Amino acid sequence: MVKVTFNSALAQKEAKKDEPKSSEEALIVPPDAVAVDCKDPGDVVPVGQRRAWCWCMCFGLAFMLAGVILGGAYLYKYFALQPDDVYYCGLKYIKDDVILNEPSADAPAARYQTIEENIKIFEEDAVEFISVPVPEFADSDPANIVHDFNKKLTAYLDLNLDKCYVIPLNTSIVMPPKNLLELLINIKAGTYLPQSYLIHEHMVITDRIENVDNLGFFIYRLCHDKETYKLQRRETIRGIQKREASNCFTIRHFENKFAVETLICS
């Protein structure tokens, strides 16, 4: 029998020869790992801070977008809003309010005067805009008038004085937009001859209105940057009314089948 043996010293020597290889393999480090270790810690942004900046940017963009939308809607309404119908009409009336149901042959002929005005009707908004140009007679002022049925207010802008006057809407004198539109269509078609009479209303200036923002879009559009005052209505009568005050001005207009002379006094 042959007994095979190994030299233990030789085995240990070969094991020692293998050790440098393993040590060399342990020293191999990827280059990118070295690059990471070389970064400045101050250049690394914390995750929480990046999230905060992201939320700030999102909120800022949302506010900017909301501002653009609201601003665009306001500018569209302010500059691009057009009335449903625009009419330029005239109304003949008897100034002295003499109405003859059956005029006699020897009766004097009735002397008619004429009011001409530009009427814009915003039917969906329940608003009437009336522009009275410089009248034929010097005893009446040109004016712009807004009747807002939603706000139940009337505003007069006297173009000579460049001042605004606001009073509660008088629905007994002012036709609703739908009815006024029908009247204007009939006048335009010639089915209604606008020969009518004149009524008088007397108003007194009271307090000044400092802020017109709450008076509705249309009255704000008419009266912003203008001196604006409240009016108090006195009794409206048919026929000539004696003028009790000398510091007055008159606006003649119509938004019904009859003409109205609005006397405004301080």
Swiss-Prot record:
The record marks R243, E244 as: Cleavage. The chain crosses the membrane at residues 55-75. Expressed in the brain, testis, testicular sperm, epididymis and mature epididymal sperm (at protein level). GO terms for cellular component: endosome membrane; extracellular space; Golgi membrane; Golgi-associated vesicle membrane; organelle membrane; plasma membrane. It comes from the Eukaryota. Disulfide bonds join C164-C223, C248-C265. Residues 102-134 are annotated as: Necessary for interaction with APP and inhibitor effects on APP processing. Residues 1-54 are cytoplasmic. Glycans are attached at N170. Residues 76-266 are lumenal. GO terms for molecular function: amyloid-beta binding; ATP binding. The ectodomain C-terminal part of the imBRI2 is processed by furin producing a secreted Bri23 peptide and a mature BRI2, membrane form (mBRI2). The remaining part of the ectodomain of mBRI2 containing the BRICHOS domain is cleaved by ADAM10 and is secreted (BRI2C, soluble form). The membrane-bound N-terminal fragment (BRI2C, membrane form) is further proteolytically processed by SPPL2A and SPPL2B through regulated intramembrane proteolysis producing a secreted C-peptide and a BRI2 intracellular domain (BRI2 ICD) released in the cytosol. Glycosylation at Asn-170 is important for cell surface localization, but doesn't affect furin- and ADAM10-induced proteolytic processing. GO terms for biological process: negative regulation of amyloid precursor protein biosynthetic process. InterPro entries: BRICHOS_dom, ITM2. PROSITE patterns: BRICHOS. Residues 137-231 form the BRICHOS domain. Keywords: Cell membrane, Disulfide bond, Endosome, Glycoprotein, Golgi apparatus, Membrane, Secreted, Signal-anchor, Transmembrane, Transmembrane helix. Homodimer; disulfide-linked. Interacts with SPPL2A and SPPL2B. Interacts with APP. Mature BRI2 (mBRI2) interacts with the APP amyloid-beta A4 protein; the interaction occurs at the cell surface and in the endocytic compartments and enable alpha- and beta-secretase-induced APP cleavage inhibition. Mature BRI2 (mBRI2) interacts with the APP C99; the interaction occurs in the endocytic compartments and enable gamma-secretase-induced C99 cleavage inhibition. May form heterodimers with Bri23 peptide and APP amyloid-beta protein 40. Belongs to the ITM2 family. Plays a regulatory role in the processing of the amyloid-beta A4 precursor protein (APP) and acts as an inhibitor of the amyloid-beta peptide aggregation and fibrils deposition. Plays a role in the induction of neurite outgrowth. Functions as a protease inhibitor by blocking access of secretases to APP cleavage sites. This is Integral membrane protein 2B. It comes from Mus musculus.
